[in-house]
From Swiss-Prot:
GO terms for biological process: ATP synthesis coupled electron transport. Residues 46-59 are mitochondrial matrix. PROSITE patterns: COX2, COX2_CUA, COX2_TM. It is an enzyme of class 7 (translocase). Its EC number is 7.1.1.9. It holds the Pfam family COX2_TM. The chain crosses the membrane at residues 15-45, 60-87. Binds a dinuclear copper A center per subunit. The gene is MT-CO2. Component of the cytochrome c oxidase (complex IV, CIV), a multisubunit enzyme composed of 14 subunits. The complex is composed of a catalytic core of 3 subunits MT-CO1, MT-CO2 and MT-CO3, encoded in the mitochondrial DNA, and 11 supernumerary subunits COX4I, COX5A, COX5B, COX6A, COX6B, COX6C, COX7A, COX7B, COX7C, COX8 and NDUFA4, which are encoded in the nuclear genome. This is Cytochrome c oxidase subunit 2. It catalyses: 4 Fe(II)-[cytochrome c] + O2 + 8 H(+)(in) = 4 Fe(III)-[cytochrome c] + 2 H2O + 4 H(+)(out). Keywords: Copper, Electron transport, Magnesium, Membrane, Metal-binding, Mitochondrion, Mitochondrion inner membrane, Respiratory chain, Translocase, Transmembrane, Transmembrane helix, Transport.
């Protein structure tokens, strides 16, 4: 999860988020090299008196500045497309959870179980216990098994929302009348926090998301106690 004065991303907890972090570093290095080259050329132009006022045609230069950007774009596009296809791929999920956005809370339904559904509201600041996080704790956490593929079906019953958990690399729009889906898989247990990431009204900032990833045995015990 995030911590005060944090500058980087949250720790990756899913294979998709790990890929996104690698892609970020890859793209940032390319941007850094381009920026360094541009700054070097600008400083060279400002500090030297050598100019080419008589140059009317330079096919070699035009060829280079056409081919080089194309190569750079390919180096950025290929890994990006790979991750996009990975995020859309869903192969035989072990569990399906339907998420509905409301003003201003989330409701969850475990479609593989009978009568396993609940609403998830933010715990007001006045009711927080010592050690709990302000504006991030909920009364009902979403308990999921770790190291298993989980399909999230996301929609809304009123306005646009967005179901997002940064450490898992998840951000799926909740649109009324439309069912979007996303896949998540956690590589380790723990609590993972997110928030609605689409402005949805006056209490938009009071729609936290808390996922509790546990071993399969603990998940089965929890689901049996909830049914």
């Amino acid at each position: 999860m995030a911590y005060p004065m944090q500058l980087g991303f949250q720790d990756a907890t899913s294979p998709i988020m790990e890929e996104l972090l690698h892609f970020h570093d890859h793209t940032l290095m390319i941007v850094f090299l381009i920026s360094s080259l541009v700054l070097y050329i600008i400083s060279l132009m400002l500090t030297t008196k050598l100019t080419h006022t008589s140059t009317m045609d330079a096919q070699e230069v035009e060829t280079v500045w056409t081919i080089l950007p194309a190569i750079i774009l390919i180096l950025i596009a290929l890994p990006s497309l790979r991750i996009l296809y990975m995020m859309d791929e869903i192969n035989n999920p072990s569990l399906t959870v339907k998420t509905m956005g409301h003003q201003w809370y989330w409701s969850y339904e475990y479609t593989d179980y009978e009568d396993l559904s609940f609403d998830s509201y933010m715990i007001p600041t006045s009711e927080l216990k010592p050690g709990e996080l302000r504006l991030l704790e909920v009364d009902n956490r979403v308990v999921l098994p770790m190291e298993m593929t989980v399909r999230m079906l996301v929609s809304s019953e009123d306005v646009l929302h967005s179901w997002a958990v940064p450490s898992l690399g998840l951000k799926t729009d909740a649109i009324p009348g439309r069912l979007n889906q996303a896949t998540l898989m956690s590589t380790r247990p723990g609590l993972y926090y997110g928030q609605c990431s689409e402005i949805c009204g006056s209490n938009h900032s009071f729609m936290p998301i808390v996922l509790e990833l546990v071993p399969l045995k603990h998940f089965e015990e929890w689901s049996a106690s909830m049914s």
